[in-house]
A protein has these predicted regions:
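Vicinal oxygen chelate
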Residues: 1-7, 29-116, 127-134
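Conserved beta-strand-loop-alpha-helix junction that forms the acyl-donor binding cleft
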Residues: 12-15, 107-108
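Short phosphate-engaging motifs
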Residues: 14-18, 84
Length: 134
């Protein structure tokens, strides 16, 4: 696996407030955002920050939004192909990660899966044909 974090996604309870905080408060540059979009992305130096409704992020990862197992944050590592996603996912499992959601074609047009590291931190491994996050 190439040692790089592509996208950090915060599961947020109040998307409008968080958008205002990061865009207006911190001055982070928005990427391709239109009012009403569920996902807000900020292009940072070498990585991206995403804001996504907390309940939708939990649903995407197939975990409960409440209780243990979901902190409201998913760290993403992007690969340039579906095959790359499968390889990294297998590598993570071989290293001791737990499969949360096997890689599959997803609603936003990409391909992704989720695993938890040995302490339960949630990682997404994804191929995004719409944006080069690799």
């Amino acid at each position: 696996m190439k040692p790089k974090i592509s996208l950090i996604t915060f599961g947020v309870r109040d998307p409008d407030r968080m958008l205002a905080f990061y865009r207006d408060g911190l001055g982070l540059p928005l990427h391709n955002y239109k009012p009403g979009d569920d996902m807000v992305m900020f292009r940072l130096e070498g990585t991206w920050l995403g804001l996504f409704p907390r309940d939708e992020l939990a649903k995407d990862a197939t975990v409960s939004v409440e209780g243990s197992g979901f902190s409201g944050v998913a760290i993403a590592h992007n690969e340039p192909s579906k095959e790359g996603v499968d390889a990294v996912f297998a590598e993570a499992l071989a290293a001791g990660a737990t499969a949360v959601k096997a890689p599959e074609d997803v609603f936003w047009g990409g391909y992704s899966g989720y695993f938890a590291d040995p302490e339960g931190n949630l990682w997404e491994v994804a191929f995004n044909p719409l944006t080069d996050l690799t």
